[in-house]
Structures are given as C-alpha cells and as structure tokens.
C-alpha cells in the first residue's frame, strides 16, 4: 500500500505549533531595543497573555504589543498559553490610546490559538473587548503593522490584527478556526484536521494570493531551526513596511486602511464569483 503524503497545509500547521518556535518576547529582544513593558487595563487586572510596552525600532520610539505563549509549564500558566482574557485586549486598547497620543507607530505580533473561552472571560465581556479593539485599530491615526508569528486563531488574533500592513512568517497560519475545530464541526471528528487545514486556506502564501497579507517572510524549514536569521529577515520587512507608511498623512493612511478592509471578499480578490 502506498503511504499517503502529508498535506502541505497540515505540515505548516505542525511547524507553526513547534514547541521550540521563537515566541513574541524572543523577537522583541532581537528586533527592538529599550523595551519597557506596561501592565494592566486599569479596569480589572493584568493579562500575561498580552504583553506590550514602549520600545525603540532602529532608534525610533514605537509601541509594541503581542501575544506570548510561554515554554515551561510555569511560563505557560503565567501567560495563559497565549490565550487572552478581556483585560488583555483592554490593556492593548490602553496602549493604543497612548501610541496615538504620542504619535508612536504600532507593531503588533500575533501568536494565539484564540481568545480564552472561559466562563469568567465571557462574564467580563470577551466579545465586547475584541470588538472594541477592532474598531479602535480601524481608526487609529498612527501606522499599524501586524505580524503573525505562529498561530493566528480566530477573533483572538483579530483583536490585534487590524493593520495597515499584515506580515506572516512563511510557516505561520491564520484562520477563523483551528483545523481540529473545523473538522469536528464538518465531519464530527478531529481526525480529519489535515483535510480541514487544506480547505481553510490558512497558509501564508494562500492568504497573500488573496490580498489579505502583504508580506511573507521566508523562514526556510522553520523559524526554530535558525531563529536569528528569521528575526533579521522580519526586521527588514518591518522596516520596509514602516517606511511605506510614515510619509503618508494620517487621514490618507486611515482611508487606505479602510479601503484595504473593505476589499476583503470582493471579486477582485478572487474570493467571490
């Protein structure tokens, strides 16, 4: 019997989830300088899954916000496996307000299975927190650049994913649902996750072909194999994106962001026929 070959999309999913894959704070340490983390949403508490603060990018003051998952058991618990609670999104809203007040470009970094689905999160307004973040990012006057580092899962990713430019690492994924979740809904079994991953179109090259992502950063066989090279490749692309956005007038930039969002799902993207 011929051995079945593993789908390219499912291979990408597995690389995106690799336990040694660089995480948000690894990139911060390599790409930015003088990072100073800020804590709390001034409403309920601090969320370890959402990390953010002031930093410098090539000497320029910026705001950096991202989801951190953790590696050790202690770290994973501290950062809630990268699954944000409402206070995480409200913390990011506070930092976005600060960025606009002081005219700081914003860099967001996505790496989450999704927003935390616990009862407490729902009681504290998870959906409202994400919706408010979407609205705020849509109208922010400063440049916003979002990067998908590993998993970009559903609304949890979108909460910091609305941007002027979106970047994906070549083995990252970005989707409305996990392949396992999709398979469980469509086929009543998570065993068809590989098939679901193909159907979801969650890979960087597919999303770039649809115009949803502007840049794809090459990471070879996986960022965990040569993290320093991948981080430097990403830094070059971040600089390119920022250089494109800085000369634009704030109103012009907001209008371009609006038009970028409005074209999603249109015929010119090849989604509808």
Curated annotation (Swiss-Prot):
Subcellular location as annotated: Cytoplasm
Keywords from the UniProt entry: ATP-binding, Cytoplasm, Fatty acid biosynthesis, Fatty acid metabolism, Lipid biosynthesis, Lipid metabolism, Nucleotide-binding, Transferase
Pathway note: Lipid metabolism; malonyl-CoA biosynthesis; malonyl-CoA from acetyl-CoA: step 1/1
Enzyme Commission (EC) number: 2.1.3.15
Segments forming domain CoA carboxyltransferase C-terminal: 1-244
Pfam families in alphabetical order: ACCA
Family named by the database record: Belongs to the AccA family.
NCBIfam families: accA, AccA_sub, PRK05724.1
Name under which the protein is recorded: Acetyl-coenzyme A carboxylase carboxyl transferase subunit alpha
Species, as recorded: Acinetobacter baumannii (strain ACICU)
Gene that produces this protein: accA
